[in-house]
Amino acid sequence: MTKPLTIAVPKGRILKDLIPLVRRAGLDSTPLEENDRRLVRPTADGAFRYVFLKPDDVPTYVEYGAADLGVSGRDTLLERRHDLYTPLDLGIGRCRLVVAGPEDTEVPDLPRVATKYPRIAGDHFASKGVVAEIIPVHGSVELAPLVGLSHLIVDIVETGSTLRENRLEVLETVTEVSTQLIANRASYKLRSDVIRPLVERLRAATAGAGR
């Protein structure tokens, strides 16, 4: 019996965007839509099994071979720098990683920067010749400049409404972010007969969504 292909998917908002894409690709999305607490859910035909994880954990499971494929944000991949193959941009979860700060505030030459993405932020400021003190935080990044923890933040922005509500403004875009299909390097080679057709079906579904 052929071993099912294991696909790691993130819980939360991205999963809601992923379901219509999976449907358009002609794949069984039923396990993704089931409202239960099982973390491993096979498809009816046994060809695939979905593993439900916290978004930050998806690349780790794929890199170490616990999952053959996964769905992960480009921001996580850039920050964590796992050894993975990225065959397809799924075109969902689009947003920006930006530098932001208080409105009408002069930024010092040696700024403190609060962020969930210390490696990306450090590389960004270093590339501009700016010596910045990077302060890792894990939640409510917008709060940091309001209470004096930092002068700037580097964070994900979708609509910008949270920044505006906290009187912060975007100063520059670090990079565009979207959701990627990722693959374990060994699986992509050894199970290419299964994975590559799946990638092409998702590619066609992604292209169709853009029309």
Swiss-Prot record:
InterPro entries: ATP_PRibTrfase_cat, ATP_PRibTrfase_CS, ATP_PRibTrfase_HisG, ATP_PRibTrfase_HisG_short. It catalyses: 1-(5-phospho-beta-D-ribosyl)-ATP + diphosphate = 5-phospho-alpha-D-ribose 1-diphosphate + ATP. It is an enzyme of class 2 (transferase). Its main location: cytoplasm. One of its GO terms (biological process) is L-histidine biosynthetic process. Its EC number is 2.4.2.17. Pathway: Amino-acid biosynthesis; L-histidine biosynthesis; L-histidine from 5-phospho-alpha-D-ribose 1-diphosphate: step 1/9. Pfam families: HisG. CDD domains: PBP2_HisGs. Keywords: Amino-acid biosynthesis, ATP-binding, Cytoplasm, Glycosyltransferase, Histidine biosynthesis, Nucleotide-binding, Transferase. It comes from the Bacteria. GO terms for molecular function: ATP binding; ATP phosphoribosyltransferase activity. The keyword ATP-binding applies. It is found in: Cytoplasm. GO terms for cellular component: cytoplasm. Catalyzes the condensation of ATP and 5-phosphoribose 1-diphosphate to form N'-(5'-phosphoribosyl)-ATP (PR-ATP). Has a crucial role in the pathway because the rate of histidine biosynthesis seems to be controlled primarily by regulation of HisG enzymatic activity. Lacks the C-terminal regulatory region which is replaced by HisZ. Heteromultimer composed of HisG and HisZ subunits. Belongs to the ATP phosphoribosyltransferase family. Short subfamily. This is ATP phosphoribosyltransferase. It comes from Sorangium cellulosum (strain So ce56) (Polyangium cellulosum (strain So ce56)). The gene is hisG.
